[in-house]
């Protein structure tokens, strides 16, 4: 139906949905399927992931915007695919984002745990709530992370280079692999507690000048350039990690939404559902 503007996939059954390549630029897609896997190659006006099986949403398309309101989700942007933006807005959630392709922007709007694995490209991560963000990956390009004033208490951990701009009080844990990271305070109340477990000095730029946090030490640096609470680290920690996903299956029903039945176990589904372009 070419007049469909809102499509909802809703089921509690164990299913796998394949959405083939196609331009559905007038359709808002909502997925409310806590036991489903989704492989998406279609381009939509918007995508809202309300619930999905913790393991996998596989993105193969280019240019989609995804909002994650699920408590637990894993989004994989495959090589050659891209997302314009991912917004994470469910407080208390645990979200994994894996970027083998490109993500232009990630917006974290709630106190959630976000694990970000970057083998491709991420344009910017904006944090506007006291979230925990763990970054890893094979990328050698520094990932820009902007921590806004409303994110007091945010915690950022990275084993890959990052460029952090902090407008409030945050913790920044840098482990081996994060050499070359840059830190800047951008607000009157900014203070960055830098734990430096890299092999190099980490420089913190403030309006009053640049301060240094030596390797194997932790220091707090505020917006006035004051350095306090310097201690020696006892050990270095690497955080983050990725997990694999499974596919599952079910049946479709009409009315712009999908539901499925399952005769399989936790690993092997009954069948896979393909939503064809002609349906939507």
Stretches found by the model and what they are:
Residues 1-186, 190-207, 211-216:
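Short, T/G/N/S-enriched strand-turn elements that build extracellular solenoid repeat scaffolds
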Residues 159-165, 179-279:
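Ser/Thr/Gly/Pro-rich low-complexity, disordered linker/stalk segments of secreted
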């Amino acid at each position: 139906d070419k007049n469909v503007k809102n499509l909802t996939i809703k089921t509690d059954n164990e299913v796998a949905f394949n959405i083939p390549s196609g331009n559905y630029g007038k359709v808002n897609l909502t997925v409310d399927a806590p036991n489903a896997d989704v492989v998406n190659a279609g381009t939509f006006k918007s995508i809202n992931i309300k619930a999905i099986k913790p393991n996998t949403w596989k993105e193969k398309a280019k240019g989609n915007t995804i909002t994650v309101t699920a408590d637990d989700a894993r989004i994989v942007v495959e090589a050659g695919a891209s997302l314009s933006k991912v917004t994470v807005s469910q407080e208390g959630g645990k979200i994994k984002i894996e970027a083998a392709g490109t993500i232009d922007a990630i917006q974290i709007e709630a106190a959630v745990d976000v694990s970000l694995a970057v083998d491709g490209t991420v344009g910017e991560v904006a944090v506007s709530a006291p979230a925990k963000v763990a970054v890893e990956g094979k990328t050698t390009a520094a990932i820009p992370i902007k921590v806004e004033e409303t994110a007091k208490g945010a915690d950022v951990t990275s084993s890959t280079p990052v460029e952090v701009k902090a407008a409030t009080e945050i913790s920044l844990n840098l482990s081996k692999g994060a050499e070359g990271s840059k830190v800047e305070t951008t607000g009157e109340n900014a203070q960055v507690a830098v734990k430096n477990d890299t092999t190099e000095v980490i420089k913190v730029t403030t309006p009053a000048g640049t301060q240094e946090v030596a390797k194997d030490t932790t220091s707090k640096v505020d917006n006035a350039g004051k350095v306090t609470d310097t201690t020696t680290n006892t050990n270095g920690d690497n955080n983050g990690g990725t997990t694999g996903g499974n596919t599952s299956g079910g049946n479709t029903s009409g009315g712009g939404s999908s539901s499925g039945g399952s005769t399989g176990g936790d690993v092997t589904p009954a069948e896979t559902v393909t939503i064809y372009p002609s349906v939507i």
